[in-house]
Each structure stands twice: as structure tokens, then as C-alpha cells.
Amino acid sequence: MSNYHHNHNYQHRPRGYERLPGKRLPDRWNIYDNVGRDIDGTRFVPFKTPLDSSFFDGKNMPVELQFGVKTLISLAQQANKQIGLVIDLTNTDRYYKKTEWADHGVKYLKLNCPGHEVNEREDLVQDFINAVKEFVNDKENDGKLIGVHCTHGLNRTGYLICRYMIDVDNYSASDAISMFEYYRGHPMEREHYKKSLYEAERKKKYGKSSGKSSGNSADSTISSEQLHRNNSQ
């Protein structure tokens, strides 16, 4: 579903737009592909955060580098795909208006994930897993994709998608990481996230973990009521 050919020369994509007049783009946002392809064997499609059109005012950015909610919906339609749920992992509400998803009939869930530490937040992992399970178990959502994004659609996004693939779909950590990176079009950058994914696989197999996690997963649930609150506010 990507509007770019995947390659790892993304460091050479145009830079500097974040320093132009108007709202400041997120750091390094422009160097990553807007959206990956839906991951084979799953419902997931990873993408970087869409931005409100006001972020592009005064920057004279090429249209293909601008990326908003409407852009993603259009790309999905062109690929004969339908996104039914978007899970937003950014730790801010400043990038776009969440009501835009509802305007396109897409459910929206916000999980505030601080950068660099989602692997220590087992409560967020379980919230993510529960939300995805609830969505895929509803027959009304058959065939619909689940869009997942953080700021760059890479590290927090990759970690949580891979955790679902490991914990629920029984992928090995190696396969989950490789698949995510292939379909996202970029490698995960946080080595401690990758290490934590291998630890999660070991914990699932042997019931032991040498790492630490915070949060109380026993009290962590995502319900239809929470999804409703996210989409009605």
C-alpha cells in the first residue's frame, strides 16, 4: 500500500523542511516512507504519523512528501483496501485531529506511549493486544486492516506489532522483526526494543524473563467502551 518503492537510502531524502516557516515538523519525520505495506498474514499496516495540513503551510513541500489522514485513506482505496481501526501510539495530540478518522468511518484508539520505553510498559502491550483481539474477533471487521503509527511508524509501532505477532500469532522474534522491517521498508532502530522482543519470546516459551517490565497487566484491559470514548470525543 506504500506510495514509495522501499529502499534503505532514505537518509538521502530531502531534509530541512522542519526548519522552514510554520509549524515545526517532527524531527526526522521527512526521511521515512509515509506508509509501509500491510504485513502478510496479519491485519497490520504500519505508517508514520499523519500531520494536519497546517504543518505544511509555507513550506512548499512536494505533494508526495505531504502526508495526512486523507492521504492514507486515499492510498488504501487505490489499493482496494479498507482500514477499520487506527491505533495511535504517539505521546501527544498535536499532530492531527483524531475526528478525521471518524469522518472516514475508521475507529480510533489512542495509547499514549512515551518514546524509548514502551518495552518496559507491559500494561501498554496488553492494551494493544486486547484492542487488536477485540477488533479481529468482530466479524463486522472481516477483511479490514489495522493501521498502527507512532511518530515515525518504526520503533514503538514495530515493537507492539511484533509483540502481538510473538505473543498471539506465535511468530519467533526473529521472524516478526524481519517481517515488520520488510513490510515497513525500514529497519527498527532501537536495539533495546529488539532485545526485549527476544526476551518476550523466551518468556513465552519458558515462562521466565530476565528483563523488567512496569505496569500491571492484570488490570490492563481495552474494552468497547474505551474505543467508543476515543471515537466520540
Curated annotation (Swiss-Prot):
Cross-referenced PROSITE patterns: TYR_PHOSPHATASE_1, TYR_PHOSPHATASE_2, TYR_PHOSPHATASE_DUAL
Positions of the UniProt region annotated as Disordered: 1-21, 204-233
InterPro entries, sorted: Dual-sp_phosphatase_cat-dom (IPR000340), mRNA_Capping_Enz/RNA_Phosphat (IPR051029), Prot-tyrosine_phosphatase-like (IPR029021), Tyr_Pase_AS (IPR016130), Tyr_Pase_cat (IPR003595), Tyr_Pase_dom (IPR000387), TYR_PHOSPHATASE_DUAL_dom (IPR020422)
Ranges annotated as biased composition (Polar residues): 218-233
Catalytic residues of the enzyme: 150 (phosphocysteine intermediate), 156 (proton donor/acceptor)
Phenotype on disruption: Arrests at the L4 larval stage due to a failure to undergo the L4 to adult molt. Sterile due to the lack of functional gametes. In RNAi-mediated knockdown assays, fails to process dsRNA which results in the accumulation of high molecular weight dsRNA-derived RNA species.
Compartment(s) where it occurs, according to its Swiss-Prot or TrEMBL record: Cytoplasm; Nucleus
UniProt GO cellular component terms: cytoplasm; nucleus
Pfam family, one: DSPc
Record keywords: Cytoplasm, Hydrolase, Nucleus, Protein phosphatase, RNA-binding, RNA-mediated gene silencing
Domain of life: Eukaryota
Biased composition (Basic residues): 1-14
GO terms (BP aspect): regulatory ncRNA-mediated gene silencing
GO-annotated molecular function: inorganic triphosphate phosphatase activity; phosphoprotein phosphatase activity; RNA binding
Occurrences of domain Tyrosine-protein phosphatase (ranges): 34-206
Gene3D superfamilies: Protein tyrosine phosphatase superfamily (3.90.190.10)
Binding positions (substrate): 151-156
EC number: 3.1.3.-
Function per UniProt: RNA polyphosphatase which has RNA 5'-triphosphatase and diphosphatase activities. Displays poor protein-tyrosine phosphatase activity. Binds to 5'-triphosphorylated RNAs (also called ppp-RNAs). Dephosphorylates ppp-RNAs converting them to 5'-monophosphorylated RNAs (also called p-RNAs). During small-RNA-mediated gene-silencing or RNA interference (RNAi), involved in the dcr-1-mediated processing of an amplified dsRNA intermediate. This is most likely in association with several components of the ERI/DICER complex including dcr-1, eri-1 and rrf-3.
Family: Belongs to the protein-tyrosine phosphatase family. Non-receptor class dual specificity subfamily.
Record protein name field: RNA/RNP complex-1-interacting phosphatase homolog
Gene: pir-1
